[in-house]
Amino acid sequence: MRFMGSPVISARNVWKIFGKDPVGYLKTLQPGRSFDDIRADGYIAGVRDVSLDVARGEMLVIMGLSGSGKSTLVRCFSRLHEITGGSIEVDGQIIGDLSEKDLIELRRNKMGMVFQSFGLLPHRTVLDNVAFPLEMRGQDRHTRRKRALEVIELVGLAGREDYFPRELSGGQQQRVGIARSLAIEPDIWFLDEPFSALDPLIRREMQDEFLRLQAMLGKTIVFITHDFDEALRLADRIAIMKDGAVEQCDTPDQIVMNPTTGYVAKFTEEIDKARVVHAGVLARAGVVGEGQPVEAGATVQQLARLLVNDSRDLIPVADKGQVIGALDRQGALDILLKAS
């Protein structure tokens, strides 16, 4: 999917260093110093020289192992952490220049946040938990109740408005957390490993629910996970982090097919590429195929029967009815056979 227009979030050369005098240290830091070099100097580089954009309506998944800097980076995006160097713009505003009042307004009106710990108020019902941020805004009881009921229905909890958190399953509690963050109708949605505490079946269910909501709402989303399969399933683009730096930021197809570092390649070794790679990525522009085209959005796995039974060497690929090129059937078969 291609996203047009100005980015909603734009980070340039962002650093977040922890230590005694991080600003002074960064001023004297020599180019090329590694994470371990910085640690040897008595500092921790939570984020190292990160530059990336998040487009409107895009779901950017930030992935990495524990300690890679993914949560620190997202906290910089919302200015829960003050950055040590560089700049971050949100909707065209340099957030480091905002007053405390303006920053609070930005968070209240444009940003929704969901974390691994649900953070529900145990003495409040589902309805009152979801309405809580609207109450903090000062909205009247009727207005906030109406909005809370809308998002409770949206996340599939209609009929449980009067339940208390202790009466809900883990997946249902996380749905309440998602509904609460949606109640303020945020433009930007930050989710920090929201499903990692759930068992695998509920986690898959919540991923399905999340994709359904995103298809309906089209939010700008920054989603953190340490699970590569989850990243591949949800992302428009994936940024893989290590030691505070972004190793590669690209579409799931490109990361699986063309990892740019050995570190990224390790994540892709056990991945069933046929499940991830789409015909549109394999299509060679300007190459002419014969016969009925396949859809650009179809994965190699979805095309398995055709690839095995078809006799064409070059198969046309169409995106929204327009032929964009042709894929080499043997190349696609190689991907399919390696997955089997």
UniProtKB/Swiss-Prot annotation:
TM region(s), chain numbering:
none
Instruction: Give the induction text.
Output: Expression is induced by TMAO.
InterPro entries (UniProt xref) = AAA+_ATPase, ABC_osmolyte_uptake_ATP-bind, ABC_transporter-like_ATP-bd, ABC_transporter-like_CS, Gly-betaine_transp_ATP-bd, P-loop_NTPase
Amino acids binding ATP: G64, L65, S66, G67, S68, G69, K70, S71
Catalyzed reactions per annotation: a quaternary ammonium(out) + ATP + H2O = a quaternary ammonium(in) + ADP + phosphate + H(+)
EC numbers, comma separated: 7.6.2.9
Keywords, in A-Z order? ATP-binding, Cell inner membrane, Cell membrane, Membrane, Nucleotide-binding, Translocase, Transport
Mention one GO biological process in which this protein takes part, according to its record.
Answer: glycine betaine transport
Name where it's found.
Cell inner membrane
Q: Where is the ABC transporter domain?
A: 32-268
**Example GO molecular function:** ATP hydrolysis activity
Task: Answer whether the UniProt record assigns the keyword ATP-binding to this protein.
Answer: yes
The record's function comment reads: Part of the ABC transporter complex TmoXWV involved in trimethylamine N-oxide (TMAO) import. Responsible for energy coupling to the transport system. Is specific for TMAO and essential for TMAO metabolism.
NCBIfam families named among the record's database cross-references: proV
Q: Which family does it belong to?
A: Belongs to the ABC transporter superfamily.
Descriptive protein name:
Trimethylamine N-oxide transport system ATP-binding protein TmoW
